[in-house]
């Protein structure tokens, strides 16, 4: 089983061909092809190769499925005996992609 670890938007993801991953919003149309070139590590046929910081010649090809927004996350702070409270909500914009090919 071959897998790859790549970096996108300040986060690291471990993927296998066929995986569906939620990445930060990329402003791409559905069915568009995306190349992810910041590959940190690749495992092919039992051989693991690490990059310094990225693996030379390695890339991940993915297809955009759709875009969306996550469920709202509520942040609530209350200070006791102060009659002070803060409530904020946050929804992450994401792009859902399917990993089609790992090139090493």
From Swiss-Prot:
Pfam families: Ribosomal_L21p. Keywords: Ribonucleoprotein, Ribosomal protein, RNA-binding, rRNA-binding. GO terms for biological process: translation. GO terms for molecular function: rRNA binding; structural constituent of ribosome. It comes from the Bacteria. The keyword rRNA-binding applies. Belongs to the bacterial ribosomal protein bL21 family. Part of the 50S ribosomal subunit. Contacts protein L20. This is Large ribosomal subunit protein bL21. It comes from Helicobacter pylori (strain G27).
């Amino acid at each position: 089983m071959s897998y790859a670890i790549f970096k996108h938007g300040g986060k690291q993801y471990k993927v296998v061909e066929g995986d569906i991953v939620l990445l930060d919003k990329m402003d791409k149309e559905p069915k568009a092809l995306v190349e992810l070139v910041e590959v940190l590590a690749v495992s092919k046929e039992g051989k693991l190769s690490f990059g310094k910081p990225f693996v030379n010649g390695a890339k991940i090809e993915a297809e955009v499925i759709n875009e969306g927004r996550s469920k709202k996350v509520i942040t609530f702070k209350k200070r006791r005996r102060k009659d002070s409270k803060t409530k904020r909500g946050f929804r992450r914009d994401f792009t859902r992609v399917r990993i089609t090919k790992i090139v090493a």
